[in-house]
Amino acid sequence: MHNKKVLILGLARSGYSAALTLNKLNCEVIINDYNTEEKLNSNQINELKELNIKCIFGSHPDDLLDKSFDYLIKNPGIRNDHKYVLKANELGIPVINEVELAYRLLPKDVNILSITGSNGKTTTTTLIYNIIKKSGLPVHLAGNIGYPICSILDKVKSGDIIVSEISCQQLANIDKFKPNIAVLTNLSPAHIDFFGNYDNYKKVKAKLFKNQTSSDIAIINNDNLDSINETKDIKSKKLFISLTNKKDVYFKDNKFYYHNELIMDRDLMFLKGNHNVENAMDAILVAKLLNINNDVIIDVLKNFRGVEHRLEYVDEVNNIKFYNDTEATNIKCTQIALSSFNEPIILFLGGLERGQNFNDLKDYIKNVKVIIGIGECRERVREFANKNNIECFIFEHLKDGFKKMVEVSKTGDIVLLSPASASWDQYKECEERGAEFKKYVEELKNGKRN
């Protein structure tokens, strides 16, 4: 990758990190983003300009990409039908992404553990990283978890381990990328707007295994039929987790087993929900493959409080427990969250109008006593609640809904922000919605809200 001419399409963290990496390789780099400079990260832009990296913002000029370029590096959030991608294909210019770039620059004997899936991948990635780190093995966390792999290249040494969360958008433009251990947590319909249909989405997810050989490991959820079907022809050695059958790691009588070896009792885990049992099983299986001591596994699983914004326990106020699941931007995630509690639930539901079918929650709401509809689709939330005879209040903004929650909540309730909706009607990112919810909980605890 030295001395190449490269067009980077899209700034963000991955484009910025790729640009810095390529600059060190004496590449001629041009970075282009449709957003104007005012809408982008000024610190990133200033650093790029100081390095004499050409930046073109505010448009995608028709004449920018030509056959003089060696590579087009595309931000994962940009679709493959973008005009530059189509033109690159016509000109025979390879289209890759930051993950692929980083992979080509890593020491050959680095061990790569990659996790993908429709749900649970961030929690699973974090659990695996925490276990390996506590064991004392040299490990780095990167990928779709906030740290581009390019950003850690200078820290990685031969023999190190990289634990990387890989999204479907990142998988869409890999070429040679090959993890030593690849984990597929599960498959369910998601990102249909990006990939066109569920079949396309599943095929992209399965690309995580495409370069693996028989000496590499694939970890599959045996209880998820789509995962089984989509990986039936891969060359990797397949290992399985299961809640219901005796597999490599399995769950029986409320206990975790690796083959016939008892690992721990589920009650020792802080995290709620069967989905977190599955996440823990993936982490246990990876840990056993790395010969990590059971005491380390148990210690991490006992003390892990979850990933921020993913069914995150926030606090308890007046014997009412608050959970922030703002990352539940689809129906499936909210189904999982609702299945995690037996106590009465006050549910915050709604956000960006995407035509999401709230009726798909009807089999999961037996413990929901009040629904507070928020955001753009709040009227449809009320229709759903009325249809299922659940008391409902609707508000445009979360802050007003939170005030109503204070009025109607009682000792022993669970207050759950699990919106089954994206947040872009009011927030730049769903994390902002979660942070606002947590702020209101803190204010309530400190006596500032009533």
Which residues make up each language-model segment?
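Glycine-rich Rossmann-fold phosphate-binding loop(s) that bind the pyrophosphate
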Residues: L11
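Short beta-strand "acidic-cap" motif of Rossmann-like dinucleotide-binding folds
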Residues: V29-D33, L141, V163, F240, ...
